[in-house]
Swiss-Prot record:
Quaternary structure and interacting proteins, as annotated: Influenza RNA polymerase is composed of three subunits: PB1, PB2 and PA. Interacts (via C-terminus) with PB1 (via N-terminus).
UniProt KW Repeat keyword: no
Source species taxonomy: Viruses, Riboviria, Orthornavirae, Negarnaviricota, Polyploviricotina
Gene: PA
Principal subcellular localization: host cell
Cofactor: Mn(2+)
Gene Ontology cellular component terms for the protein in this record: host cell cytoplasm; host cell nucleus
Name of protein: Polymerase acidic protein
Known function: Plays an essential role in viral RNA transcription and replication by forming the heterotrimeric polymerase complex together with PB1 and PB2 subunits. The complex transcribes viral mRNAs by using a unique mechanism called cap-snatching. It consists in the hijacking and cleavage of host capped pre-mRNAs. These short capped RNAs are then used as primers for viral mRNAs. The PB2 subunit is responsible for the binding of the 5' cap of cellular pre-mRNAs which are subsequently cleaved after 10-13 nucleotides by the PA subunit that carries the endonuclease activity.
Changes after translation: Phosphorylated on serines and threonines by host kinases, including human casein kinase II.
Length: 716
């Protein structure tokens, strides 16, 4: 790699990169990937500024090399590549002369035309994620961010790309060439995998002041200081009688340890009430896709272009009407919102050039659906001190709901195979350490089992929707932006396919804190008639919008097409986790690995191959009311993945509480099965803690019912 860098880059750039690395105590001969990355970044910064000048009138102009007009002023000041002291001197001098706010981190360039600092990024990873990391690190709206990737993608603050297309194309071509050159020498894979996220340095802190006093105050009785208590805990020998130890620790505790027998545990009490309703951010088994195969239209890859192309594949549109109203909403507004989407998509088509994004007109129906001007006015606490009767407003207890059969059907469907592949082989990420080829082999076997799984489709759909929504929330805060819900896959024959599930319209999104909410309206296609399970669709208004001709064994049948519309909301932190749903693949792969490891240690050899290729063997998947469920290893992989995906899709405080508390009971039951004669105290309190989490969440209720099945079979 070092030789390649010295051949590929201008000697001045190589020298600057070496200097920069030495300044941070790094060796270009050892950290060769970092050396290449620094050179690439420097070259992009220089290319960004090359040939760009400002003329006497203050306009930006491009002048190629060799032009005699030496009186022109450079448009960009290059900060990257200078030593730190010099760089900060330049930044300070710019801030003093222009009045621009001083940045927290050293930027790469200053743009005299736009009067702003510019941060240039070059990434080998997914461009959206890198952009968000940069934005989170800089935390300044004044510094303009512009990211390039080696795949020819780019992303910039508010989609303002600063330079003309030709200059940017030059940079993209150069990056592509570097990638090709590296690949031809077998260096690309290691370079691509070596990129780490943006790092911020955390300070180590001692416990002092108030925190120290709080720590001392919260010690158990009979302890004078934190050190004293730590020493006691470190030296605590847990043998002997537990009751005695407990009474030693505190006079108030008197615990009677009760033996835990097969007859001790009772089933969890599930709540009574109306059946629970669907609460995921997008439709799962009921979703319908409008798809195009081998997309090659102009602007392919731009979501709005793709969406319009997908919409054109369907010819059965009809005058929409409401078939299942939302109990509490103003249903005609949902109908008008869909009509508005259709009308505005039609308007786009009539324009000469289709725009890359579409902001909806702020009509009364959209303002209502997105809760515009509905938030209560915020008042500064200082202005309220004099009111004696200040109190938090009363909120009702959530209404209890009973388990409904649809959530088990949703889960079963998520474990099934589809006829498309949703991930490429390297989606789970390459091995970083050369830990033999076993890890790669396991990953490839696992990927083969889950790449066609419906849960994997949900992952890619979730990643896409959350990424698009978070980007729009940051880039178009005040706009009601129309966001197509899109996914991409490959057919059995390996043909690329782009799918449209429907649309989202985003509300105002001035998201300062992680938990600030952005409202959105989702409109999703479906063939499911909502009248079959109206309780599932309590939060939706459902329209009938067309008729679809389906091929079946008995010929062509016409089925009504529905649109599921609802108001929903999410936050920055939820979108961040949604963008990272691919982690579910990793989590379930690790669970499978631990099963293989256990098997391998018994047999004293690696069992990976036998594990995946012995199709006759069945494995325990779980326990249902019917008994212990068994299936192939592929089914185990897909079930574990579906569980992980549903934990992400249905994440909630109820799930957190249920998982943490039920685990304690699970461990006690496991100990009983292993003949370890467990003892418990306050088992009633544990049941109470578990059951207070069983309120109305469909996924938690299903897990609780599975838990009851497990108890029944475990204690036979």
């Amino acid at each position: 790699m070092e030789d390649f860098v010295r051949q590929c880059f201008n000697p001045m750039i190589v020298e600057l990169a070496e200097k920069a690395m030495k300044e941070y105590g790094e060796d270009p001969k050892i950290e060769t990937n970092k050396f290449a990355a620094i050179c690439t970044h420097l070259e992009v910064c220089f290319m960004y500024s090359d040939f760009h000048f400002i003329d006497e009138r203050g306009d930006s102009i491009i002048v190629e090399v060799g032009d005699p007009n030496a009186l022109l002023k450079h448009r960009f000041e290059i900060i990257e590549g200078r030593d730190r002291n010099m760089a900060w001197t330049v930044v300070n001098s710019i801030c003093n002369t222009t009045g621009v706010e001083k940045p927290k981190f050293l930027p790469d360039l200053y743009d005299y035309k736009e009067n702003r600092f510019v941060e240039i990024g070059v990434t080998r990873r997914e461009i959206h994620i890198y952009y968000l990391e940069k934005a989170n690190k800089i935390k300044s709206e004044k510094t303009h961010i512009h990211i390039f990737s080696f795949t020819g993608e780019e992303m910039a603050t508010k989609a303002d790309y600063t330079l003309d297309e030709e200059s940017r194309a030059r940079i993209k071509t150069r990056l592509f060439t570097i990638r090709q050159e590296m690949a031809s020498r077998g260096l690309w894979d290691s370079f691509r995998q070596s990129e780490r996220g943006e790092e911020t340095i955390e300070e180590r802190f001692e416990i002092t002041g108030t925190m120290r006093r709080l720590a001392d105050q919260s010690l158990p009785p009979n302890f004078s200081s934190l050190e004293n208590f730590r020493a006691y805990v470190d030296g605590f020998e847990p043998n002997g009688c537990i009751e005695g130890k407990l009474s030693q620790m505190s006079k108030e505790v008197n615990a009677r340890i009760e033996p835990f027998l097969k007859t001790t545990p009772r089933p969890l009490r599930l709540p009574e009430g109306p059946p629970c309703s669907q609460r995921s951010k997008f439709l799962l088994m009921d979703a319908l896709k409008l798809s195009i195969e081998d997309p090659s239209h102009e602007g392919e890859g731009i979501p709005l272009y793709d969406a319009i192309k997908c919409m054109k594949t369907f010819f059965g549109w009809k005058e929409p009407n409401i078939v299942k109203p939302h109990e509490k909403g103003i249903n005609p507004n949902y109908l008008l919102a869909w009509k508005q989407v259709l009308a505005e998509l039609q308007d786009i088509e009539n324009e000469e050039k289709i725009p890359k994004t579409k902001n909806m007109k702020k009509t009364s129906q959209l303002k209502w659906a997105l809760g515009e001007n509905m938030a209560p006015e915020k008042v500064d606490f200082e202005d309220c001190r004099d009111f004696s009767d200040l109190k938090q407003y009363n909120s009702d207890e959530p209404e209890q709901r009973s388990l409904a059969s649809w959530i088990q059907s949703e889960f079963n469907k998520a474990c099934e195979l589809t006829d498309s592949s949703w991930i490429e082989l390297d989606e789970i990420g390459e091995d970083v350490a050369p830990i033999e080829h076993i890890a790669s082999m396991r990953r490839n076997y696992f990927t083969a089992e889950v790449s066609h799984c419906r849960a994997t489709e949900y992952i890619m759909k979730g990643v896409y929707i959350n990424t698009a929504l978070l980007n729009a929330s940051c880039a178009a805060m005040d706009d009601f932006q129309l966001i197509p819900m899109i996914s991409k896959c490959r057919t059995k024959e390996g043909r690329r396919k782009t799918n449209l599930y429907g649309f989202i319209i985003k509300g105002r999104s001035h998201l300062r804190n992680d938990t600030d909410v952005v409202n959105f309206v989702s409109m999703e296609f479906s063939l499911t008639d909502p009248r079959l399970e109206p309780h599932k669709w309590e939060k939706y208004c459902v329209l009938e919008i067309g008729d679809m001709i389906l091929r079946t064994a008995i010929g062509h049948v016409s089925r009504p097409m529905f649109l599921y519309v609802r108001t929903n909301g999410t936050s920055k932190i939820k979108m961040k986790w949604g963008m990272e749903m691919r982690r579910c693949l990793l989590q379930s792969l690790q669970q499978i690995e631990s099963i293989i490891e256990a098997e391998s240690s018994v047999k004293e050899k690696d069992m990976t191959k036998e594990f995946f290729e012995n199709k006759s063997e069945t494995w325990t998947i779980g326990e249902s009311p019917k008994g212990v469920e068994e299936g192939s290893i592929g089914k185990v992989c897909r079930t574990l993945l579906a569980k992980s995906v549903f934990n992400s899709l249905y994440a909630s405080p109820q799930l957190e509480g249920f998982s943490a508390e039920s685990r304690k009971l699970l461990l006690i039951v496991q100990a009983l099965r292993d003949n370890l004669e467990p003892g418990t105290f306050d088992l009633g309190g544990l049941y109470e803690a578990i059951e207070e989490c069983l309120i109305n969440d469909p996924w938690v209720l299903l897990n609780a019912s599975w838990f009851n099945s497990f108890l029944t079979h475990a204690l036979k």
